[in-house]
Amino acid sequence: MDYLKTVVPSQLMAERGANLVVINPGSSNVRIGFASQDVPFNIPHCIARHITQRKDDTPRLSVRDKMLNCHATPSQNAERERAYDIIASLLKIPFLDEEMPSANQALPPKMGRVDALSSQQNKDDSKFTWTDVMDRSIKSSTPIVDKDADVDPLQRSTPDDTEPNSEENMYKEIIFGEDALKIPPSESYCLSHPIRRGHFNISQDYSLHQVLEDLRTIWNWILTEKLHINPRDRHLYSAILVLGETFDNREIKEMLSIVLCDLGFSTAVIHQEALAAAFGNGLSTSCVVNIGAQVTQVVCVEDGVALPHTALALPYGGDDISRCLLWVQRRHRTWPNFQTDPVNRPIDMLMLNKLKESYSQIRSGSFDAVSVVHSYEHEKSVGHQKTKLSALNVPPMGLLYPRVLVPEEYPPPPRSWFQDYDDMLEDTWQTSDSLYSSGNGGFGMWDNYPMFPTRLKKFDNIGLVEAIVSSILSTGRIELQRKLFCSIQLVGGTASTAGLAPVLEQRVLNTIPSNQPIEKAEVLQSRSYPLFVPWKGGVILGVLDIGRDAWIHREDWAKNGVHIGSGRKYRDSYFLQAQAMCYYNS
């Protein structure tokens, strides 16, 4: 302990972080890096596999995200219009039937405008290159362990079973990361996202086995190609999994098995994302608001312990704001005549996310920006047009008024998913059939998961302000409530939205019931980029964990799996039961 008091933090990170790999998986991106790094690799959490088309089929890119509801229903459109009117009134945005200035007229005094594109930026934004799907590397008759480790032997073409110059062998079998999002639509690839809305993307068309295989392949590729860790040397490394509170016990167990058994790490530990976020900003008590790409989580942390009864999950995030941006532009008739389809064309979603990150902010009055919008309908000639984007302050307000977002819905997993016989805390065999949906009910993927109804409360239609107030007030102690209201912490990519923090402060304070003796609400400024705060917190927790009482060894996990022990650490953790049941005799 004397050494910890005198050592420089950077030196401690370098000494103990060289053999620690921190993995923070999300629905849209996965953040992986050595604990000794300042920032992790942030890579799209997806994989594209080459598929063989029948002769009578037209080759095309397919997206394996089966959704019950991709487009807004008439009732949802009506609610969305009402929500837009409320937001427009609050932000003092002129309605469409009011007279708007033409493109040649000067903007009125209350209308803001951002001409953020310089000539050089305009030139760079107009350039786009599709992913080259042809494998131009030289095929060797001797397989290389490092390169072949991330490919399933059953799906990999080898010189022994195919001709080297065959047409099938010319295509890349697997494409990862952002390259997978830029595959030309005419190519025969299937794009898969293993995680959606904070859960495994299991459906009748995407089996659990394939989800796990895709996770293993993606993570293995990052470890090999980005971190340059040879599969034969991974027994020298330990892994830290920083997982969100939305993940189910079985999902945690499966990811732990991937890290230890498939990827070959010697030991691993799991940390809650909310707890890691608090430590990442140097806090021990905080209300952590994690605004992810597809899920927003609110969890209160007291003295380094996440309080389970305060956890809330909201089924919307940054991706929904990006789609709302497109809807707002079409509503204002400012979007070019492009067939933009963010659901079925991943490159369109990538473009909308970049527009959102560049221009969306919360501010009063009309807010416009001039930007280049791309059309990816024709592969040989990617079209682009410079256009004025209107009401850019409306989409991020969807965090406060979620009815304007209209998130897509995913079907529930098959019934067999709920039968986890290893979980000693769940009597799934006693669950009646009425608790499961047939898949046609139109509800979110996991909303009817019945095993722990109070484990993580989920709300579809409440805004972020109401969620924060409800979470903090559920602690029940006025002293703690005052601390939490003064230490609200925003993490996640969307947390960087300009103007979000002051709006939350004001609205949270106004939403607190008048009978509560609380006079102040404050959103703390993040010490680093909010997207990487949970990952950085995982680094800190891993480096400072000297005793490693909660670390799980590969041999013990492979032999015993989930079992009860006598250790005390994480015994009271309500979320990480997959790890909490794996104690070690002290």
Curated annotation (Swiss-Prot):
Pfam families registered for this protein in UniProt: Actin
Gene3D superfamilies xrefs = 3.30.420.40, Actin, Chain A, domain 4 (3.90.640.10)
Q: Residues annotated as region Disordered?
A: 141-169
UniProt lists the family membership as follows: Belongs to the actin family. ARP8 subfamily.
Name of the protein described by the UniProt record? Actin-related protein 9
